[in-house]
Regions:
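Alpha-helical transmembrane segments and their immediate juxtamembrane cytosolic regions
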Residues: 2-385
């Protein structure tokens, strides 16, 4: 073999060339990763039914108030309903406050869902009283809740103190002790309606202590049957007590001394009424249906109905509607009851909720700082653009 050929052989010049590399077919783009949405939390029909029925009783109680002076039966119904309707509502509020942990998100909802509506409705009620009540000098005071707004103040305070009640060893006995002390303390005064805040406190704390199985117990068939004679006994006792008892005890807005009673009676009445209220609340829950009914959806709008019906309830007094003689007959009392139930039902409907959402559930993102995670997420998205 000649030298040039040998040289070419050594350098690989005579090697068989490799086949041309084929372009790999383009890979199909991977489908985008779909992040599953968290499941929508379904509302519990039982509690929505309970809230709706409780708020109907609240409206009926307000409608019966001007009638009880002329009708012992109306007075008995009034006392019976006032024994448990707000306690039931407050127990439910406490039960659904169990997860409150003072995190930024929950504090924001506390401000927008409780504090802001309080300011709006306190001012609105004041102007309504000036106009409809012919009291043009009635002052605006956020420290003196008028009529129904006391509940918003109380709920704000109760919910804000929830983390404290979750760490103390005996929350309910402590809450009862506070309520008893309030009932014998006339110097508490009227600021923020603290008497009601403190005297109704045990029902909120009771709700915090309850678990789902406790509600299952009162919803048994045996409990429903037992609730009937209990309510009948309560009505009979209320009929006997109506002309003998000061109904202001049920409002829990005054101390014993302010009701012209001896101081020791405040402790007795607070503990006795708490026991009676808890029994009737349990009987009320026993009768609440657990399935979805035509009024179940209205349970989401009970706070709307509660605050809005106050204008009609007070207006009926300002405008002397109850001066009509026929309203103080059995037929008139039934008519008032039906009208109160129909009114509160209408005020809990979705159209009314949409109309007044600006006042009850305002969007106020502009008023709050963004938390660190949200801010970092926003900066990261901006950099990727």
């Amino acid at each position: 073999m000649s030298e040039p050929v040998r040289s070419m052989h050594r350098t690989g010049a005579l090697r068989t060339p490799l086949p041309a590399a084929r372009n790999a077919p383009p890979r199909a783009p991977e489908p985008p990763t779909v992040v599953p949405k968290p499941p929508v939390k379904r509302r519990d029909s039982f509690f929505d039914n309970a809230k709706y029925l409780a708020i109907v009783l609240v409206a009926m109680g307000h409608a019966w108030e001007p009638l009880r002076g002329d009708s012992r039966a109306a007075a008995a119904l009034y006392i019976t309903v006032y024994t448990f309707h707000m306690p039931a509502f407050i127990v439910i509020s406490g039960y659904f406050s169990r997860t409150f942990d003072a995190s930024p998100g929950r504090l924001k909802r506390l401000v927008t869902g409780i504090a802001v509506p309080y300011v709006i409705f306190e001012v609105a009620y004041t102007f309504f009283k000036r106009w409809a009540g012919d009291d043009p000098t009635y002052p605006i005071s956020l420290l003196d809740p008028w009529y129904l707004t006391w509940f918003l103040v109380a709920l704000f305070v109760w919910r804000l103190t929830t983390p404290l009640w979750k760490v103390v060893r005996w929350p309910l006995p402590i809450a009862l002790a506070i309520a008893v002390l309030a009932s014998v303390s006339p110097d508490i005064g009227d600021d923020l309606d603290l008497q009601r805040v403190l005297q109704f406190l045990p029902f909120f704390v009771l709700g915090l202590c309850l678990k789902p199985e406790h509600f299952q117990i009162v919803r048994r068939r045996e409990a429903r049957i037992l609730a009937l004679p209990v309510f009948a006994t309560a009505l009979l006792f209320a009929y006997w007590a109506a002309p003998r008892m000061n109904a202001a005890w049920f409002y829990r807005r005054d101390s014993a001394q302010e009701l012209a009673a001896p101081g020791w009676s405040g402790a007795v009445m607070t503990l006795g009424m708490f026991g009676c209220s808890v029994i009737l609340v349990a009987c009320f829950f026993a009768w609440v249906p657990g399935r979805r009914l035509w009024f179940t959806a209205l349970g989401a709008g009970t706070l709307y109905g509660y605050l809005l019906h106050g204008f009609i309830a007070k207006g009926s007094r300002f405008w002397d509607w109850y001066e009509l003689d026929w309203l103080h007959t059995p037929a008139g009392e039934i008519t008032v009851t039906v009208c109160a139930a129909a009114l509160i039902t209408a005020l809990c409907t979705p159209p009314v909720q949409r109309l007044f959402k600006f006042a009850m559930e305002p969007e106020m993102e502009w008023a709050f700082k963004k938390d660190a995670k949200t801010s970092a997420r926003g900066r990261g998205a901006h950099r990727r653009r």
